[in-house]
Amino acid sequence: MSTKYVFVTGGVVSALGKGITAASLGRLLKNRGVKISIQKFDPYLNVDPGTMSPYQHGEVFVTDDGAETDLDLGHYERFIDESLTQNSNVTTGKIYSSVIEKERRGEYLGGTVQVIPHITNAIKDKVYQVAKDRDVDVVITEIGGTVGDIESQPFLESIRQIKSEVGAENVCYIHVTLVPYLGKAGELKTKPTQHSVKELRMIGIQPDIIVCRTEKELSDDVKAKIGLFCNIDGRSVIQNLDAENLYEVPLMLHSEGLDNLVCEKLHLGCKDIDNSEWIQMVQKIKNLKNNVKIALVGKYVELHDAYISVVEALSHGGYANNTNVEIKWINAENIENSNAQELLKDVDGILVPGGFGDRGIEGKIAAIKWARENKKPFLGICLGMQCAVIEYARSVLGYEDANSSEINPGTNYPVIDLMPDQKDIENLGGTMRLGLYPCRLAENTNSYEVYKNEIINERHRHRYEFNNEFRKQITEAGMKIAGTSPDERLVEIVEVEDHPWYVAVQFHPELKSRPNKPHKLFVGFIKAALEENKSK
């Protein structure tokens, strides 16, 4: 069977959930025995989101092969339970950069380089490359932005051309739109959807399926009206109601017949669907018996999407412990030693996530100090691990100005320092320690207890590391080195003795957590928080 292609576009407004729609379809097709892969096209000119502010873009999701990508790839991986690659996220910047590099090398033989065909061909190559690399039945591609955005036009033209190249029977266009409900009028308005589809058809794309985000159910009459004016069958108009939990969305879209429509359009000959595992998981999520409150002490807490994988991983850890996780968001700039007790006294665990720069550092250190001294379950991630080492050096070893050389280049005690291979790097984009690396765990540690493995593999995104010049002093003072690189050169995990759960890791465990396969560190952390809750 030739590879099939599904393209998911969006209209009316952004943030409609195209990514969740694509991920949900991927899950449904996988549950029908179809081999799938998903990719995201982002129309911005950045080569990748690695240097973008979290306030601009939300979380940067890192793949096994070290690509810094859009947060939607996190949704894709969590839903389809497969690891993606750098080819799964393509930006305008990446496309233009590759085309210009080819032009400089003379690969266009002196021809005039244009958007059509050179940019569009490069975009199409990225779609075909995923099909080739992954040996899949279906490639699902989400086009970022909304129809009508000038930045999206080369991508839309490219997916229009793909239909001509591979045949109409091998392509399905899904358009996600908004059907707003006007409370005063008491009716759903279909005109925005009609105009969005009109815009799409003007550039040569006729959607096969329209997924309508709505807060009210669409009647058959409303679906028929949308179908009539958008030139599709009424049953190809799918409602996507707001869900209490993201993981309900695949089941809701299945009940609307989305996967059946795609299988019919692409002549996939799918097996009967087996959603039993997913249904069981969703039912479990709806009936959690316990509750814990976790403080998330970060610098971007106003935008929860900046920590979306951490939030999801905490929830996954809760599912494994039959526990609902409530997050108490604490701005690291608002916490200090004098008010830590007041801000943290009602929580069952404290998590300090990753980040960059000096803003909020002292607040993170204050939260970690309180967690250590009050024996409150603590999980530090990336910068959170570095802050844990700094706090320990200051409070236990008495190195009052201990710091990271990132924060204070003049510190007398740079317990966190720039990695040697990072010292001569000038460009910021794509130059950190990125992607999957192995780690050897020490026995008789919390980390070894939860992983139950000597060698683990986790994803990294950092430039700074534990400074080995201080390893002897810090370990002799009671901080355990619980995990290192296999050559023991890099410290990856630290723990504190005589504490119920104090684990800080240099890597990002949240990036590998899945709802059906919660990450073991988060399972252990929430278990410790639950024990803390029950001991009150």
UniProtKB/Swiss-Prot annotation:
<comment type="similarity">
    <text>Belongs to the CTP synthase family.</text>
</comment>
<dbReference type="GO" id="GO:0042802">
    <property type="term" value="F:identical protein binding"/>
</dbReference>
<feature type="binding site">
    <location>
        <begin position="383"/>
        <end position="386"/>
    </location>
    <ligand>
        <name>L-glutamine</name>
    </ligand>
</feature>
<keyword id="KW-0460">Magnesium</keyword>
<feature type="binding site">
    <location>
        <position position="355"/>
    </location>
    <ligand>
        <name>L-glutamine</name>
    </ligand>
</feature>
<feature type="binding site">
    <location>
        <begin position="15"/>
        <end position="20"/>
    </location>
    <ligand>
        <name>ATP</name>
    </ligand>
</feature>
<comment type="subunit">
    <text>Homotetramer.</text>
</comment>
<feature type="binding site">
    <location>
        <position position="14"/>
    </location>
    <ligand>
        <name>CTP</name>
    </ligand>
</feature>
<feature type="active site">
    <location>
        <position position="510"/>
    </location>
</feature>
<dbReference type="InterPro" id="IPR029062">
    <property type="entry name" value="Class_I_gatase-like"/>
</dbReference>
<comment type="function">
    <text>Catalyzes the ATP-dependent amination of UTP to CTP with either L-glutamine or ammonia as the source of nitrogen. Regulates intracellular CTP levels through interactions with the four ribonucleotide triphosphates.</text>
</comment>
<dbReference type="GO" id="GO:0005524">
    <property type="term" value="F:ATP binding"/>
</dbReference>
<dbReference type="GO" id="GO:0005829">
    <property type="term" value="C:cytosol"/>
</dbReference>
<comment type="pathway">
    <text>Pyrimidine metabolism; CTP biosynthesis via de novo pathway; CTP from UDP: step 2/2.</text>
</comment>
<feature type="binding site">
    <location>
        <begin position="189"/>
        <end position="194"/>
    </location>
    <ligand>
        <name>UTP</name>
    </ligand>
</feature>
<keyword id="KW-0547">Nucleotide-binding</keyword>
<feature type="binding site">
    <location>
        <begin position="189"/>
        <end position="194"/>
    </location>
    <ligand>
        <name>CTP</name>
    </ligand>
</feature>
<dbReference type="InterPro" id="IPR027417">
    <property type="entry name" value="P-loop_NTPase"/>
</dbReference>
<feature type="binding site">
    <location>
        <position position="142"/>
    </location>
    <ligand>
        <name>Mg(2+)</name>
    </ligand>
</feature>
<dbReference type="GO" id="GO:0004359">
    <property type="term" value="F:glutaminase activity"/>
</dbReference>
<keyword id="KW-0665">Pyrimidine biosynthesis</keyword>
<feature type="domain" description="Glutamine amidotransferase type-1">
    <location>
        <begin position="293"/>
        <end position="535"/>
    </location>
</feature>
<dbReference type="GO" id="GO:0019856">
    <property type="term" value="P:pyrimidine nucleobase biosynthetic process"/>
</dbReference>
<dbReference type="Pfam" id="PF00117">
    <property type="entry name" value="GATase"/>
</dbReference>
<dbReference type="GO" id="GO:0003883">
    <property type="term" value="F:CTP synthase activity"/>
</dbReference>
<feature type="binding site">
    <location>
        <position position="72"/>
    </location>
    <ligand>
        <name>Mg(2+)</name>
    </ligand>
</feature>
<dbReference type="InterPro" id="IPR033828">
    <property type="entry name" value="GATase1_CTP_Synthase"/>
</dbReference>
<protein>
    <recommendedName>
        <fullName>CTP synthase</fullName>
        <ecNumber>6.3.4.2</ecNumber>
    </recommendedName>
</protein>
<dbReference type="InterPro" id="IPR017926">
    <property type="entry name" value="GATASE"/>
</dbReference>
<dbReference type="Pfam" id="PF06418">
    <property type="entry name" value="CTP_synth_N"/>
</dbReference>
<keyword id="KW-0315">Glutamine amidotransferase</keyword>
<feature type="binding site">
    <location>
        <position position="225"/>
    </location>
    <ligand>
        <name>CTP</name>
    </ligand>
</feature>
<feature type="binding site">
    <location>
        <begin position="149"/>
        <end position="151"/>
    </location>
    <ligand>
        <name>CTP</name>
    </ligand>
</feature>
<feature type="active site" description="Nucleophile; for glutamine hydrolysis">
    <location>
        <position position="382"/>
    </location>
</feature>
<feature type="binding site">
    <location>
        <position position="55"/>
    </location>
    <ligand>
        <name>L-glutamine</name>
    </ligand>
</feature>
<feature type="binding site">
    <location>
        <position position="463"/>
    </location>
    <ligand>
        <name>L-glutamine</name>
    </ligand>
</feature>
<feature type="binding site">
    <location>
        <position position="406"/>
    </location>
    <ligand>
        <name>L-glutamine</name>
    </ligand>
</feature>
<dbReference type="InterPro" id="IPR017456">
    <property type="entry name" value="CTP_synthase_N"/>
</dbReference>
<dbReference type="GO" id="GO:0044210">
    <property type="term" value="P:'de novo' CTP biosynthetic process"/>
</dbReference>
<dbReference type="InterPro" id="IPR004468">
    <property type="entry name" value="CTP_synthase"/>
</dbReference>
<keyword id="KW-0067">ATP-binding</keyword>
<dbReference type="GO" id="GO:0046872">
    <property type="term" value="F:metal ion binding"/>
</dbReference>
